[in-house]
Structures are given as structure tokens and as C-alpha cells.
Amino acid sequence: MALRPAKIDRYVDKPAYTRREYIRGAPGPKITIFDMGNPAGDFEFEVALHVSQPVQIRQNALEAARQQVNRYLQKNVGRSNYHFKIRVYPFQVLRENPMATGRKADRYGNGMRRPFGKPIGLAARLKKDQKVLSIRVNRQHLKFAIEGARRAAMKFPVKCYYRIYDKEGNDVTTKILSQGL
């Protein structure tokens, strides 16, 4: 079955559906690596990507963003000069009630009889202003981290923004951007 458009699953309008012991045939997570680069490194800044409204992000989008950002940072910064972390996990099980279409669909389709749906994928539920991912780097690589966050934001079905934090966790976005990169 083809992958449905992300706009169908992005809204947080239904209750959470995460109890896997009740779900037959729930798919496994596609994203398995959450820490990339140098996790033990000591870095000056953290560039974090936040979502601007409550949303569900499918695991396909998270994995696409992870691959894109990791490849970009490895190429431009080097493996030991950054720590990239995905901060959400896809717990939400997405369901679909497949509707029969075409000639004589009424003969074999169920319509709205038992319409609960079958599991088709997983998604991460995010609240407003929640961090999706973070990239820790030193000052000389800050522009690459910001570009990586921008590239990741393109993969998500919601408007995102980034913030720059220092080691203590203080928001220094305006200070850094006013000084220039």
C-alpha cells in the first residue's frame, strides 16, 4: 500500500494510541540510531530545532531528517566535531481503514463496518515549542549546524524554528546572530 500524504497524520486531534500489547501487527520503528557524531565531545553551543505548534511527525520524516543532517555534518564538519541527537521517539501507532474503490467495490468492501483500521506506521507526538533534534558544535562550525537544522525542518510537516544555547542552557540566539557567524 502506498504511503499516504503526511498532512493526513500531522494533526493531534485523536487520543494517543501507544499501547503495543493491545495492537496486533504494530510496525517496528524505522529509526534506530538517535545519537550521531561524537557524544562524548565537549562543545560550546547547541543548536536545537523546535516545532511551532502541536503536531505528529511520522517516523519516515524523522529518519529522512536524520540521514540528511548526519550526511551534511559529516561532510562539512567531520565526524568528531559535532554531536547530533534526535530528541523524540515515535510511540504513536497510526491506523488506516482501507476503503474499497472501483467497480463492484460494494460487493467486497466493508464500508464503515468495523472501521477501527489496521496499523500502518508510527509517529512522534510533539507539543508546542518542543525540541525535535539538537546539534552540539563549537563556534567555528555553528553555521553548518544552523544549516543542518534548516535542512531538517524541510522534512517536517510543520513550521519549525531553531534556537542556539550555550553550555549552561541559556538562549543566546540573538547575541550570536547579532555578532555574526
From Swiss-Prot:
<dbReference type="GO" id="GO:0005840">
    <property type="term" value="C:ribosome"/>
</dbReference>
<dbReference type="GO" id="GO:0003735">
    <property type="term" value="F:structural constituent of ribosome"/>
</dbReference>
<dbReference type="GO" id="GO:1990904">
    <property type="term" value="C:ribonucleoprotein complex"/>
</dbReference>
<protein>
    <recommendedName>
        <fullName>Large ribosomal subunit protein uL16</fullName>
    </recommendedName>
</protein>
<dbReference type="InterPro" id="IPR047873">
    <property type="entry name" value="Ribosomal_uL16"/>
</dbReference>
<dbReference type="Pfam" id="PF00252">
    <property type="entry name" value="Ribosomal_L16"/>
</dbReference>
<keyword id="KW-0689">Ribosomal protein</keyword>
<keyword id="KW-0687">Ribonucleoprotein</keyword>
<dbReference type="InterPro" id="IPR036920">
    <property type="entry name" value="Ribosomal_uL16_sf"/>
</dbReference>
<dbReference type="InterPro" id="IPR018255">
    <property type="entry name" value="Ribosomal_uL16_CS_euk_arc"/>
</dbReference>
<dbReference type="GO" id="GO:0006412">
    <property type="term" value="P:translation"/>
</dbReference>
<dbReference type="InterPro" id="IPR001197">
    <property type="entry name" value="Ribosomal_uL16_euk_arch"/>
</dbReference>
<dbReference type="InterPro" id="IPR016180">
    <property type="entry name" value="Ribosomal_uL16_dom"/>
</dbReference>
<dbReference type="InterPro" id="IPR022981">
    <property type="entry name" value="Ribosomal_uL16_arc"/>
</dbReference>
<comment type="similarity">
    <text>Belongs to the universal ribosomal protein uL16 family.</text>
</comment>
